[in-house]
Every structure is written in C-alpha cells, then in structure tokens.
Amino acid sequence: MRPSTVTSRIWWSESSSSSSHDLSGSWEHTSLQRTSDHFSSMGSIDSLDHSSQLYPSGHLSSAKSNSSIDHLGGHSKRDSAYGSFSTCSSTPDHTLPKADASSTENILYKVGLWEASRPGSSRQSQSTGDPQGLQDRPSSFLPRVPGNSSKSPRPEDNIEPKIATSGRSNFGPVWYVPDKKKAPSPPPLGLPLRSDSFAVAARGHEKARGPPFSDLASMQHFTTLPHVQPRGDRRMETTDRQWKLAHPSSGKEIGNVGYQPEGHLDCRWLCSDDRAGRPSGAPGRHQFSLSSTDVHFLKSYHGSQHPQPCSDESPRFPSSPRELLRITPSGCLQEPPELSQDDNPAQVRWPGSVNQKLDDRGRSHYFSVPHRQPVHGSAHVLIPRSDYWHSDTTPVDLECPLLRPDQRGYPQQYEETPASHERGGYQQLNAGIEGCCSGIHEPPRASHTVRAGLQCPGNDFKLVDAESGRISRQRTPMLHSLTQDGAWRPGNSKDCGNEKPPLLDAQVGKPTRRSDRFATTLRNEIQMRRAKLQKSKSTVTLAGDSEAEDCAGDWRVDVGAVPEGSFPSTYKEHLKEAQTRVLKATSFQRRDLDPTPADQYPGPPEHRTCDHSASSSLSSFPGEPDSAPRLCEAGLAKPPSSAGGVPHILRIGGRKRFTAEQKLKSYSEPEKINEVGLSGDHSPHPTIRTSEDSVGTFADRWKFFEETSKSLLQKPGHRQAFCGIPREKAERPQTQGHECESTEPWFQKRSRATSCGEILSEDRKVEKASEKLNPPRRLGTFAEYQASWKEQKKSLEARSSGRYHSADDILDAGLDQQQRPQYIHERSRSSPSTDHYSQEVPVEPNRQAEDSGGQKEALLCTLQAEEGCSAPSSSVLSSAQPQDSQHVNEDPTSPQPEAQLSSKCQHLQTSTMETSRSPSPQFAPQKLTDKPPLLIHEDNSARYCPVTACYVFIPCRLQVFVAGALPQLQTLGIERVMDNNTTVKMVPIKIVHSESQPEKESRQSLACPAELPALPSGLEKDQIKTLSTSEQCYSRFCVYTRQEVETPHRARPPEPQPPSTPAPPVRDSCSSPPSLNYGKAKEKTVDDLKSEELAREIVGKDKSLADILDPSVKIKTTMDLMEGIFPKDEYLLEEAQQRRKLLPKVPSPRVTEDNSCPSLSAICYNLGTRSKSVPVSQLIKIKILASSPRKQDPGMPGVVSLATNSTYYSTSAPKAELLIKMKDLQEPEEYSAGDLDHDLSIKKQELIDSISRKLQVLREARESLLEDIQANNALGDEVEAIVKDVCKPNEFDKFRMFIGDLDKVVNLLLSLSGRLARVENALNNLDDSPSPGDRQSLLEKQRVLTQQHEDAKELKENLDRRERIVFDILATYLSEENLADYEHFVKMKSALIIEQRELEDKIHLGEEQLKCLFDSLQPERSK
C-alpha cells in the first residue's frame, strides 16, 4: 500500500467503500483516536478538511472515494495531485487542548526543518504528469520512516518521516504573517504559496525551474528558526506517535504520501505541522475550532504565539481577511485543480524561492500529507497576511486561486489527466480563476459567502481599487465579502494583519456552528439539489476541441516561463480572459429570470464572478455522469452578481423560479423549455469571443465532444443524462477519462456542463429556424452520428441543436438528405428509446421528409393496403377522391414530395384514408417507421398502419402485399366496388375485390419483378392467411398477417370466389360480408327473395316437400354447433380461397348475389365471382325457381327426411345462370293456360336442375379441398421434418402429439356436433303425439351428447393451450418463414377438416333434396 493509502487509512477503514453520496456517514470521529491530535498540522486545522463533503453528490468525496486510495495507489496520474494537496486532517480534534494550537511560526519552523533535513535532490519531483515521480519521491524518504522519530530527541532527526507519513495532510503553508505592527515589507523570502493561487505563487511559477528545494528549505528555516528549539522535542514525540497511528505499516506505505485520494485538495502551500516537529501541545494546534463548518483563520505571526483558543461551538473569525483564502469546500485548501497535481510545478512555493524547481515543488507537497478524509468538510480559511507578500505581488488575488475544488470537490487536477499535469501546476496560471470561478462548492449554508469570497477579482488584484464600483454588497454580495474593509488591497494589508473580518458564514445570516457539519449539510443539500436537477430540463453544453486547444495553450503558462516582474499583469490578464470566457460560455444568466437589470453584469466581463463559471455546472466526470451538474446547477448556479442586494438572496436550489407564464410555456411547449425566460432579442452569441482563447463556438464544442466521446450505446445507463438534452449531448466522454480531460481546460469542462445556459437556449432558437432548412438526419448508430459531426463544422447559426423531437419529428427525420442536415438522434418527448426503434435502413435522397408520423404511416398503410384493391397501375380513383388520386398515383421514379402527401394525410387518416390507393406497392412512398418489428422492404412494401394496428408487411413466405381488405379497415365503413374500370363505390363494411382475369393479368404485368419477388410455389398454402380474393392471392397483394395480428379479424375477411368459375353453392351463401356467419344471411338478396317465393309456391302445392323446401323450417347443423369452438368463418373463408383457385370453371356471365345488400354495391361483399358485367336488370330478371331462405344451413343430412331447404345451396353464379336459362325456357309455359300441375312440375324440374348443378359444384369443391388437404399435409410433413431437426426430442414429441391430437379433437367435435344437431332436429320435428319412449330416448341422447360435446370443448381448450406451448418452443428454433409455415399448417389443418365435413354434409343434403324432388315428380309423370 502506498503512503497515500496509509495516510487515509484512519478514515478509510470504514468509509473507503462507502457510497459517494453518503458524504459524511462513515466519518467516525471516535474511530480516529485522536489521530487529528497526532496528525493535525495545526490542531484544529484538521477540521479544515471537513468541507470535503462539498463534492457534488455524484462525485466521490475526498474521504469516501472508493478509488481514492486504491486507485491513487495505482499510480493514477490524478493521484499525484492528491499528494500535492495537503488536505488537512478531516478528523476534528475533539480532545486536543485549546492551548495546543500551532502558530504560523511553528508550521513554518517545521517546514524549514523538513526542507533542511532533506537533500534538495531527494525533493526533486518528476515533471507533472509523471506518475513514477510520485513513487520516487515517497521512496526517497522511505528509509527515514521507520522509528527514528521516536528515538531522536531532535526534531530534525525524524521530522521528515513523520511529516511525510503523517496521516494528516497539513493545511497549506501557513505563512509568516507579521503583525500589522511589524514592518510592512516581509522578508525577501516568499511564503509557501499555492503556485497558482496567489500572486506570489505565480511569481514562484515564473521561476518554477528555480533553485533546488534546498533553497526553499533554507528560506523556510529562515522564517521559522526562532521557534525551532522550543518545539523540537515535543514535536518529535507527537509526530512519531502520529506516524505510528497513521501508518501502521510505516515503511512501505510512505511511498504513497504524495498520492492523495480523489477529492483531496492539494495543500501544497502548507507543510505539515506535525511533520515540522512542532510539539503536539503547541498552542498553534488549537488555533482553529473543530467545528466542521467553522471558518478558521490563522492568526498573525505574533497572534499565533499567543493564540486565543476558540471554542468549538463559537463562530470563528479570520485573523485577517487573507485567511479567507484558505477556505476549501473539501476542508483543504484547494488550488486550481490543474495546479494541485502532485507534479505541478506550483506546488509548495515560497515567494522568495524564485529558483525553486518544479521538482522541488513537487517534493515539497509530499510533506503535506494529504488527508483523504476531511471529516466535516468545514470550510476553514487560512489566508496569509497580505503584508507578508512582496509589495510587487498584490495579495488581492490570493483569494482568487483559492480552492477550486473540481466539480466533484476534487481539485480540477483530478479531472485533468496527466496531460493537464504536463501543462504544469500552473497550467492555468490564473487557475485562481478556477479556484474563484469554480467557486467553492460548499454547502450553500456555510459557504455562500465563501463562494463569493473565493471568486477572483477582476482586472487586477485590487478588487476594490478599480472595480469597487462594480462590486457591492447589494449586487455582488460574494465578491463584496472579499473586498470589504479593503482587506485585499496591498495597501491595507498591513492594517488588517490582526483584524478579524466577520465570519464568512455570518454573512449568510448566522455564524457557523460546530453543529452545522458540512458533511450532513452538504450531503442533504446535494441530495436535494440532485433531485431537483433530475427534474429540471437542464441542458449541458459541451466544450469544443478548438477551445480546448486554444485555452490549453493559454493556460499552459510554464512556471519558469513567466518573468518575476511580469507575473501580476500576466495573472490578471488570464483572470480577465478566463472569467470572460467562462461567464460568456457558461453563464446561467437569463434575462427573464434575473430580477433586475443589475444582473446583466453591466461591468466588464472580467468582473463577473468566476464563481459563476463554477456554478455553471460541474463537468460530468467519466463514470459520474450525473454528479457534475448537480451541485453547481442547483446550488451554485447563481451568478455572483445576480442582483438582489443581500447575500442570502440566492436562487432557491440554485435557480430562480419560473413565473406562471413561463411554467405554462414550459408545460405547453416542452420542446421550448430551454427558451423559457429568454427575451427574443437577447442573444448570447455576440458575447462569444472569437479570439484564439475564446471558449469557442458550440460547433467546436460539439466537435470536441465527438472526438473525445465514445459510443453512446456503450453506457446505456447514462443515456438519460439530462432530460432537456438529446442523449448525445448529455452523454459525456465517460469512457475517455483522462484523455478527454487532458485535452480541455477547466473552463471548457464547465461550459461543457453548463446547464440551461443562455447560449444553448439561444442556439436552440436559431436551430429551430435552421432545422426547417436542414432537417436533422437520423443515424442508425452512434458511430455514424459521431463520425458525422466531423463533417459538420457549421456556424452557430446554422447549427442544429438536439432539441426535443416529438414522435412526429422522429418520423420526419432523415428523409431529406439532399441537404446536409445536422445528424441528430431525435429523442421522443415521451420515450427515450423511440429513436432506436427506427430501422437502420438507408433512405434514398429523393424521399422527402414528411410532416406527421402517424398520418404518414396511416397513409402509407392505406396506400399499400389498397394495392390489392387497385386495378391496373394506371387506374385512377373515382371522382369521389380527387385529392387522393393526386398524391397516390405518383410515378415511382419521381414521387411527389412527401411534404405534399403529408399536407393531405390528415384527411386520409379518417375513414376516407382507405380511399387513397396507389396502383402498386412501388408507388407507395417509402418511409422509415419507428416500429422495430417491421419488415422494411426495398420497395417500401412493409408498413405498420397505426390506424388499423396491424402490420402490413411482405411475408417471409409470400412476398405478397396488402390486398384491399385489412381486417380492421372494415370498421371504417369503407367498401370498394371494383369493376373492370376500377371505379370505386363507397359502401359499408369491407372491401374484397375480385378481379376479372384481364384485371389480374394486367395487374400482375404491372408488378415489377424487380420490386416484388415472384410468389413462391407454396403460395397456395399461405393463401389461407390472406384476407382477399383468390385473384389477390395471385396478384401478390394479399395481406399475409401474422397469426397474432390476424386472429381478431381472420373471421372477418370475406372470402372471394373465383371469378372464372361458378363458386360452390356452399361458398355462395358465404359470400356475404364477414360479419355474416357462413351459410347464414342477415339480409336477403333479390335472388333469395325469388327463391323463397318459388319454394313457397312448390310447398304450397306439394306439402310433402314442405320439410325440405319450407324457408321457415329451422334446423340445426353441425356447423351451428361448431360455432364458437373454431372460428368457422375464418377457416372456411380461408379454405375457400385455397379451393377457389383450384376450381377454374366455365367463365359464364358471373352474376353477383350478395346476401347483405340487394343493390349492386352488395357485389363487393361477394366472395364469389363478381362479374361487374352483369347488369342489375339481368339480376332482377333472374327467376329463382327453387330456393328457400338461406337462414337454414342444411347441416344434418338424414335428421329429418328431406328436411332441408334450398337455401342450403345459396345461389351462386352458376345457379343464377341456370335459373336465367330455365326462366327463359319456362316463361312461355308459365304464362300459358295455367296447368298448375304442369307448372309445379316445371318448377320442380328447375329446382332439380339447380340443385344438381350445385351438387356438381360442391363435388368439384370437395375435390379441390382434398387437394388442399394434401398440400397442407405435405407442408405439415416439411414442418415436422424441420422441427425434428432443430428441436429436442421431447419438444418434437410435444409437437407431434399436438398435431395428432388436433386432428382427433377436431373430428371428435365435428362428430359430436353432427350427432347432437340430428338429435335436436329430431326432437324439433316430433309429431304432436309422439310416443313417450321416442321422445324420452331422444332427450336422453341429447343429454349425453351435450355432455360429451362440453367435454370435447374442454379438450379443445386444452389443445389451444398446448398449441401456444408448442408455438413458443418452435419460435425459438424456427425461422420466421418456417414458423409462418407451421402456423399456416396448424390453422389450415383444422379449417380443412371442418370444411371437408361441411361439404360432405351439404352434398349429402343436396342429394336428399334431389331424391325428394324426383320422387315427387314420379307420381305426376305417372299421371
């Protein structure tokens, strides 16, 4: 374990693994065992670390970071920064005597001892970013660690090891702060300062490569020599004891002292007290109260000698304003993150050590043993007296570089990778901006003023001199806290040496008390803010590479490169530039949200508080996507100068409340939520600097993001990011870690994490206009999207931000690709994942974007669903739908822009939507759909119709497309009557178009083979699943719906009849609309009425035929009893489609008769031949000689002798033709001298002929049905072979048993139904005085059969359950095509069995009717 891990062990034993959100839970003070007493460099200084809890909730706290030790121990480059930070012990010294506070001189003395005792070479630290240097340095004092600390009476002997190994990081350098009575000019030797934090530090930077640390050591001696003797012995003992406590495995663990756990601040300025060998009881130790929230200030040099111990509970007041500087949210002094790196050149600096080398500084921080666990995160402020500083370095800025814990509470260095280390500890010489700009991310309670106070001054170090007009208590309360009393002016520095400015916390309304633990406060507040942020629609802007490069260059000010004299100006320049950039890029300022115009930052941009940048939103760190913006957005998002007058007037939760109007807008127009509050004329763009060091445009930030981020899909858990931004925007370069960070300076990180910034908001306005010109393209993969950004270096005005896209927008995106739009993953307002539903199918450029998704899809579905109904492609819609024809009948090669289609989609979406038809699928506009299950066909034949809620897609097997009748469309009440001229007539219910042979041929010729694959040979097997006529099956426009989609309507679709052949009489009756049960008519056609009339005439003359021909006779059939068990219509209709093509017969004039409608429109319902060539007049002329109402489906032959009626053979085209001929032949006789008997015989003969004809048709149908059964069995054999190959034996057995049982159960049900129907018919036809025995026997049979029938139904239910199980099994093994074959086979098997049974019954009944008629004619003939 490296020393850093040892150092933190005292805390880490319990908290290292604790949640990053539980910032204070595991910091047990009791377990620390007075470690703070032993390890604290200044007694209560330990408590200075307590504000580590200021880390945003998402970030690991310094104490609790799981990776802080282990990861740091792993030579993480970020670790080095920890070493440089001397995070004061977070453990409060509850037991330390108040008199034990160490004074500044003691600390300095100790530092001197450390430095003097160490050879300068050993202090040589590796250049920044060199993790190995970290190891080397700790190893340099490993030998000393052992136990000499306890043996040697002289502090010099073992101070080193103790210092190096002390579990307590010392709280920054405590400089010799002379009393104001002392000479104002301090000794030439500079105080140890954070290189980037203070002007002196900056001077040190200028001479970063200066003298070896030995010089520094000597300087330190010089400062502290007077106190060496008195403190040495006691200090040695305590440090030894501390060493043992903190470093049980002293020797090898020391090496990691430099490695600080994440989240610890680099207190390089301060050398450890403990290590200095100061006696543990030294008064300086209790300089500070243990209160976690206390802001402690080092007393002046003299004051510290006679410390005034403060009670833990009493508020602390800084000895001098300068002490404010030391406030750090994590309880440690935080220097700008970049600076805080272990190897940072600007580590421990003394103003006088101009020649000090980067290495030396790197070593010096080792003596500031980082404490990973600032316990309470109290914000302690240690600010050296300004008079100590050389006059040329204005200490005014000391505050600026103050701790800028990185968004997570770590110094930013932790966000910055070694690359940032390479930039030098002074990577941002004005990291003070970071420190100040980042503001202290402390719990707002205790540190509101701290945040303000830590903000950098403006142009020069004199906050008040030049900018006093701009910094006021009312307008800039935070800055005001820093500037009050002129404490920061060099001229005033002497006077305020012993002066105690009011406690920072007091400015927020109450003194900080010990009970106000930052840990608890911060944790609670972070959680609260985090919850708020998650609800907010904040967006995060991403810093671009260009700014990263520009700014990195600006900030890479080498420590040794800056001449000593030029430092102040350089530092000020950087401050101004950085402040301006950060404020412009990340400002939360929104004019509508600012209470007064004063919030507009009237002053120069440099006076805009740097805290604002910090508040903009902490950049999300890899692996912690959410944490970044939480604290900053919620709590620190307030521009420091946000007018309001008093410090406590801050935005609640870090943001101001929307007005009712703004809320209304945000709710009613969610996509514009980021514009809420922005005045239309307010545009932040002009404020964006285009200079080389400017933050850069959003385009640059996007570019940076794209180059540094990885695929969005790699971290799906982070995809939600912030609600208000597209995932790609919210997504951080999470997996890039340090790479990404090293390439961008801190302010870019901030701008990258800015939430709801003005720039983003304004850009979105601009984007909305630009999006109209450049509709965003959808990209299938993030990789494409990422690559596309590199193509799109667009200006801000042309750039398209990823605004919310509604579902319509998602559908719209990506079709207009002739322009070069921004690539955007559109995000559905309601669903974060809708954009991933889109099929990654390239869209041809000529396909135009459509305006509305649902309407377009409905249109497309309609267009394609009507393909089957459309006549030849040149067909034109009837005048009833002129506008439909406009955009439906488009040439496939030059489709009309979809924009036009979309303009008319709306009216198509209603019932009329079905009327719009395109001649063939290739004419239907293609469009990506957002439904994953769709099969997108190259000719766009696949479409999901939202209106009908069914998929219309090219089946794997059939490759046929939609025929006019989508099952649900019948509810639209739209029906088409297609004649050869493709005229359209609107009639209720469903469209089933039976084309004539020429139509079929012409349409097939129109179907381009290239676009529609030829129908497979097994088409007939699949036709059962189509919803249209047989011609439609042939025409490849049939709907081949999945079972699950189709089941609700499979019973509905009408069954077509072959136009060229007389439909079987069985089917004729079924040619009624789907709503009619097979064999039953709800309405009587003209032919039915005439048939009934003829039957009545025959029955009236021959009572013996009444039972057979009387329309009023009600008989039950097998199919009646089977109803509800198997969807009879579904299977029969499908089977009829199968059969129909196998029955090519005489192409006689096809007369359509429909049971549902006595008008020509009824033709549309006819599943039989719909020859539109037969005029209505001819239908009217038809005289049906033998027909009875179709209400009776003769089902049971022999139940009642000849007890069936002619409606059993619902009139078909052949029958109509026969009747017409018979009528023509018989008319003369009918109207001749009325021989009734002769006329009756003629009528009977006509009926016999008709029945004979129908029987012939039925027999032919039976033959075709047998062929269908054979074909289906062959299909079943194929499926069984496939299943046997792919399935497990037991699964195959289930399949085979199910198929066998299916056959048995269907036959059983049919048999029982037939028997039960016969019994019931017999009971109904009993004479008025039947013998009791006959009725009793029939009733008993009825009871038994009824019970058996119920049992058979239960078997069927069980069979259905097994069918689902088998289907689930096969679905895992079979391809979609094979699975469709299986479904088809199963459905057809039962359907064909039932159909076969029904045909047999009908044939049997027809034969009985013929027999009866012949018998009735014999007596007459005999006469």
From Swiss-Prot:
Keywords: Actin-binding, Cell junction, Cell membrane, Cytoplasm, Cytoskeleton, Developmental protein, Membrane, Microtubule, Phosphoprotein, Tight junction. Belongs to the shroom family. It comes from the Eukaryota. Residues 1092-1418 form the ASD2 domain. The modification Phosphoserine is found at S103, S185, S197, S291, S806, S830, S831, S833, S918, S920, S1072, S1329. GO terms for biological process: actin filament organization; cell migration; cell-cell junction maintenance; melanosome organization; negative regulation of actin filament depolymerization. Residues 28-69, 83-93, 119-130, 891-923 have a biased composition (Polar residues). InterPro entries: ASD1_dom, ASD2_dom, Shroom_fam. Its main location: membrane. Residues 575-677 form the ASD1 domain. This is Protein Shroom2. Residues 1-101, 116-171, 300-357, 586-630, 758-855, 872-930, 1045-1085 are annotated as: Disordered. Interacts with F-actin. The keyword Cell membrane applies. The modification Phosphothreonine is found at T834. GO terms for molecular function: actin binding; actin filament binding; beta-catenin binding; protein domain specific binding. Residues 761-771 have a biased composition (Basic and acidic residues). It is found in: Apical cell membrane; Cell junction, Tight junction; Cytoplasm, Cytoskeleton. Residues 1054-1065 have a biased composition (Pro residues). GO terms for cellular component: adherens junction; apical junction complex; apical plasma membrane; bicellular tight junction; cell cortex; cell-cell junction; cortical actin cytoskeleton; cytoplasm. The ASD1 domain mediates F-actin binding. Residues 8-27, 872-885 have a biased composition (Low complexity).
